[in-house]
Amino acid sequence: MIKALFNKNTALAAVAILALSGGAMAESAKTHKTDMAKKKVSELTCEDFNGLEESFKPTVVGWVVGFNKKGKEEDAVIDVDGIETVTPAIIEACKQEPKASFWKKAEAELKKVF
């Protein structure tokens, strides 16, 4: 278990930087990631989440776990095992409905695990 306090602005910046990093990409992928970096997390779609590197998806899910329903950061113990359990469920839910709100899909799956 890891004790972590997430800062929303720092997390958003990290998501944007990591989403935009990488080697050579097709122009459409660059455009998609640039558009994603401009969105608030509450505006992200499952399609945006699906476009992330597989290895980064648990990090995004962990960040979502670190916020309560009011969008405020919490001083909480992060359940790494829980994140590893719920991440595949969120990935599958987002594959089923790519146009759906990522935040809402993540919250629904998190309620099943936490």
From Swiss-Prot:
Transmembrane segments: none annotated. InterPro entries: HdeA, HdeA/HdeB_sf, HdeA_sf, HNS-dep_expression_A/B. GO terms for biological process: cellular stress response to acidic pH. It comes from the Bacteria. It is found in: Periplasm. SUPFAM superfamilies: Protein HNS-dependent expression A, HdeA. Disulfide bonds join 46-94. GO terms for cellular component: outer membrane-bounded periplasmic space. The keyword Disulfide bond applies. Keywords: Chaperone, Disulfide bond, Periplasm, Signal. Residues 1-26 form the signal peptide. Belongs to the HdeA family. HAMAP family: HdeA (MF_00946). Required for optimal acid stress protection. Exhibits a chaperone-like activity only at low pH by suppressing non-specifically the aggregation of denaturated periplasmic proteins. Contributes to acid resistance. Not required for wild-type virulence in the BALB/c mouse model. This is Probable acid stress chaperone HdeA. The lineage of its organism: Bacteria, Pseudomonadati, Pseudomonadota, Alphaproteobacteria, Hyphomicrobiales. The gene is hdeA.
